[in-house]
Amino acid sequence: MGAVEGLTEFLPVSSTGHMILTGHLIGFDDDRAKVFEVVIQLGSILAVVVIFWKRLWSLVGIGKVTDGPSLNLLHIIIGMIPAGVLGVLFHSAIKEVLFGPGPVVISLVAGGILMIVAEKFSKPSTARTLDEITYKQAFTIGMFQCLALWPGFSRSGSTISGGLLARVSHTAAAEYTFILAVPMMVAASGLDLIKSWDILSTADIPLFATGFITAFVVAMLAIVSFLKLLSRVKLTPFAYYRFILAAVFYFFIM
């Protein structure tokens, strides 16, 4: 499960869908499994921190990535606001209504359609690099990140699609998505971990540590490979994969 999490967390294929399917197939889907998923997700987040550490330092005023105008902390805050507000207001409702096999199948298909539409109707990029993203584009991407509150939609799938429609290049949208994910995922995972702390025991440490490390290593490889691949293959192949996954999900889980 650590490998599945690391591979799918930052690809536009829905890590949630893969984790539910994997947990079902191996018979690991109880409350302890849910805490395990939170822990290995933190391993994936650490991979982003390691890969983009210079950029993250620059956001808090330590060091500069470029001499000219560059991505700053306000870009990240603006991108966080829409999903952050909705997540806080409707956290319980989202958990109760959208966390289930049926909604996940629907979101897998809907997310795939969004990606195809974004590729078809996107215009030439005005922001080809991360440092050319405007505040308006950051807010647009943040609005599309709200879709990721629906399990199965995929954070990267929805935000990269939003970036394309806002005239941000594939690579710049993906890099912004990964950086934007750090505070959002740390906050969400931290909250879930605190709420589930009483489920953990010292006997779980070896299992959780193995999953954490595996997710970290695989996520490192997945992020680097995805950024190299994205400029050549675009989002469409991932959209078709989502349709296949939705069919598998429907027949094996529902």
Curated annotation (Swiss-Prot):
This is Undecaprenyl-diphosphatase 3. One of its GO terms (biological process) is cell wall organization. GO terms for molecular function: undecaprenyl-diphosphatase activity. GO terms for cellular component: plasma membrane. Signal peptide: none annotated. Keywords: Antibiotic resistance, Cell membrane, Cell shape, Cell wall biogenesis/degradation, Hydrolase, Membrane, Peptidoglycan synthesis, Transmembrane, Transmembrane helix. It is an enzyme of class 3 (hydrolase). Bacitracin is thought to be involved in the inhibition of peptidoglycan synthesis by sequestering undecaprenyl diphosphate, thereby reducing the pool of lipid carrier available. Belongs to the UppP family. PANTHER family: UNDECAPRENYL-DIPHOSPHATASE (PTHR30622:SF3). The keyword RNA-binding does not apply.
